[in-house]
Amino acid sequence: MNNSTALQTLDAILEIYARPFNDLIYAAQQVHRLHFDPNAIQCSTLLSIKTGGCPEDCGYCSQSVHHQTALQAEPLMDLEQVRAAAREAKANGAQRLCMGAAWRSPHDRDIEKVAAMIGVVKEYGLESCVTLGMLKPGQAERLQHAGLDYYNHNLDTSPEFYGEVIHTRSYQDRLDTLEAVRDAGIRICSGGILGMGESRRDRARMLQVLAQLPQAPESIPINALVPIPGTPLEAAEPIDGFEFVRTVAVTRILFPKAYVRLSAGREAMSDELQALAFLAGANSIFLGDRLLTTGNASTGHDQALFNRLGLHRSAD
């Protein structure tokens, strides 16, 4: 277990969740100020380097071959496309470029191509992150050798609810990939998706599993489901805004030193809801009007919101 937070029982985490809203936000903000500048937001950019055609059946995803969505599959980007994206990310003030590929598990030849992309990203002084699916022995080490800073592999939800959403990859597969990444000396980015029909207990359980990893993730993305037509979750009810903010606050309390990122779904959030999430301890966002396959708040809108709230981009 990584630290005292890993000793939290599920009931204890649920008790934190159930605190009066003002008390919960106050506690989370106190924790946040112990480890971060409360007005600094870390900014990343997300790039889909290989889109669609994924053999997995994740119920939320437009890239699955199992679902009838309007998404058109695209091949792996070439280095010059990645270079252009890195240049734009740097110009927009991002500190990290996160590259995602719709693979179940990459071939070794794919890893070599991604390794070259990581090199291009590093040329621009950006941190690098990739999300490529499950990794085979030796692949994490190759990525680390290429200079990879972060590997994203979300747990998505609790072990108990997971089977309601995904059938082609086990929960243990995800944990095994996180272990391989950590063993290779790469920092971990891992979180979940809210609003898939899970309960508060499921959300608390997911956080408990993350807390029980040998070392806590350095980055924890909190996604709000973006229902996509043609996917099994297209009619899912959106998560209550206060429940979303509660989850951010509990995440901050359990993981004092992690970056807590507002990820997918932010485009649909009001400025007021985002401000509450920042107050609850969120301190990272994706810049740009596109994530992997869904929309995102524009960089101009984000900067205007930062100005209204007195926030600034983190220099770390």
Swiss-Prot record:
The alphabetized UniProt keywords are: 2Fe-2S, 4Fe-4S, Biotin biosynthesis, Iron, Iron-sulfur, Metal-binding, S-adenosyl-L-methionine, Transferase
Q: What domain of life does the native source organism fall in?
A: Bacteria
* Functional pathway: Cofactor biosynthesis; biotin biosynthesis; biotin from 7,8-diaminononanoate: step 2/2
Q: Which cofactor does it need?
A: [4Fe-4S] cluster; [2Fe-2S] cluster
In what residue span(s) does the Radical SAM core domain sit?
39-263
Q: Which GO terms describe its biological process?
A: biotin biosynthetic process
For this protein, the record's Gene3D superfamilies field holds:
Aldolase class I
The kind of enzyme this is, by top-level EC class, is transferase
One GO MF annotation is: iron ion binding
Please tell me where [4Fe-4S] cluster binds in this chain.
54, 58, 61
The record's listing under PROSITE patterns reads: RADICAL_SAM
Q: List the disulfide bonds.
A: none
| Reaction(s) the record says it catalyses | (4R,5S)-dethiobiotin + (sulfur carrier)-SH + 2 reduced [2Fe-2S]-[ferredoxin] + 2 S-adenosyl-L-methionine = (sulfur carrier)-H + biotin + 2 5'-deoxyadenosine + 2 L-methionine + 2 oxidized [2Fe-2S]-[ferredoxin]
A Pfam family assignment: BATS
EC numbers, comma separated? 2.8.1.6
Q: Which residues bind [2Fe-2S] cluster?
A: 98, 129, 189, 261
Q: How is the cofactor bound?
A: Binds 1 [4Fe-4S] cluster. The cluster is coordinated with 3 cysteines and an exchangeable S-adenosyl-L-methionine.
The protein's role, per its UniProt record: Catalyzes the conversion of dethiobiotin (DTB) to biotin by the insertion of a sulfur atom into dethiobiotin via a radical-based mechanism.
Similarity-based family? Belongs to the radical SAM superfamily. Biotin synthase family.
Q: How does it assemble?
A: Homodimer.
The name this protein carries in UniProt is Biotin synthase
What is the native source organism of this protein?
A: Acidithiobacillus ferrooxidans (strain ATCC 23270 / DSM 14882 / CIP 104768 / NCIMB 8455)
